[in-house]
Amino acid sequence: MMKMKQQGLVADLLPNIRVMKTFGHFVFNYYNDNSSKYLHKVYCCVNLFMLLLQFGLCAVNLIVESADVDDLTANTITLLFFTHSIVKICYFAIRSKYFYRTWAIWNNPNSHPLFAESNARYHAIALKKMRLLLFLVGGTTMLAAVAWTVLTFFEHPIRKIVDPVTNETEIIELPQLLIRSFYPFDAGKGITHVLVLVYQFYWVLFMLIDANSLDVLFCSWLLFACEQLQHLKQIMKPLMELSATLDTVVPNSSELFKAGSADHLRDGDNPPPPPPPQSDNMLDLDLRNIYSNRQDFTATFRPTAGMTFNGGVGPNGLTKKQEALVRSAIKYWVERHKHIVRLVTAVGDAYGFALLLHMLTTTITLTLLAYQATKVNGINVYAASTIGYILYTFGQVFLFCIFGNRLIEESTSVMEAAYSCHWYDGSEEAKTFVQIVCQQCQKAMSISGAKFFTVSLDLFASVLGAVVTYFMVLVQLK
């Protein structure tokens, strides 16, 4: 059994995890006792059976009503629309280890005393945005389920059957249900009708939430990565100022130091601290208790020429421990950027193939919806349902693309932030650091759909353009 760990992305995304557990996703970690885990396994299996049962009955109805082209198209759209949910439930169950790995990847992030406040601020911003995203998508999903239910009672469904011999059209009244489905009994009368309505409402609600909860999880990961990149950009300027204090020149080479500005080391009457123990790697020093007050952490160091280099003070006016703190700040930035890259890579591994399946299904659905849209001839239930399908389907794609596009923009803007700093006034270490940053950030971070496409607004624009073009062609041919 794996105990609940209130840390990292698990703690940040705990509301998302609870929603996924509540609505039947196979999330079998983060429990406090084995009994809850066992009961949840039974619940998930029963829930999946109920969802698959209704999905299968819809497929049978598709075959039964395949004689009429309009009915065939409408039933196919419904089946494809809910295919997302079945695919994502099964996808998570099969590839859950990749999702657990992504949740755990931020359990032990590196930290630095100089940038703790900035890190906490951007973490709080990310947390607020992730909660807001979950609330908005959850509210929209509930509204869609209610609208779907209400729309059902505005029109009594019928089915037209054309007699091939007499060419007469026979109209058959169908049960007033949320979705057209085959049942081996009469589902249009009495208590049976009520029970089927309740079952179908449960089915629609759970299917919508199961699909969207996994989509929100994906977008929350990207949102968190974007805010971490914002954090790195924000600390770039103070990091450059710190890096500029380092220099590797030998003593008495004061001509290499530029004239300082008003920023300087705070002079004190206390004698310099004793030299620290020598170490082969200054980056690995324990930096705790180096400074005793806040001013020591916020001081801006200036190279000081002509001073006596003793007592552990180097040619740049920094003690060995101060130099170690500055170098550890550079190390913090690099390691945090590597950590973000690992997070984005893990997200792509966990969700990339699901994105491919989603886009393939969506492409077929939108193509059929474009055909359905050409048959809209007024304000009625048919028009409302067609428009609802289109808006909801495009909304799902847009949700992926807007966060994928932001990840690309934020990752490329890191290089711009590094280049715009006054790196040319710094030491050789500062210049080397900026060069490495620019080289590593030339290629933008992105999420791909199993290497077939990149999730961005360009993808959304191409899908939208293709659907509009196809719709206009159908209108011209009509």
From Swiss-Prot:
Glycans are attached at N167. Residues 261-281 are annotated as: Disordered. It is found in: Cell membrane. The chain crosses the membrane at residues 44-64, 74-94, 134-154, 191-211, 350-370, 383-403, 455-475. Present in antennae (at protein level). Residues 65-73, 155-190, 371-382, 476-478 are extracellular. It comes from the Eukaryota. It holds the Pfam family 7tm_6. One of its GO terms (biological process) is detection of pheromone. It is a multi-pass membrane protein. The keyword Ribonucleoprotein does not apply. In contrast to other ant species, C.biroi ants reproduce via parthenogenesis, enabling stable germline modifications from the clonal progeny of injected individuals without laboratory crosses. Belongs to the insect chemoreceptor superfamily. Heteromeric odorant receptor channel (TC 1.A.69) family. Orco subfamily. PANTHER family: ODORANT RECEPTOR, ODORANT RECEPTOR CORECEPTOR. This is Odorant receptor coreceptor. It comes from Ooceraea biroi. The lineage of its organism: Eukaryota, Metazoa, Ecdysozoa, Arthropoda, Hexapoda. The gene is Orco.
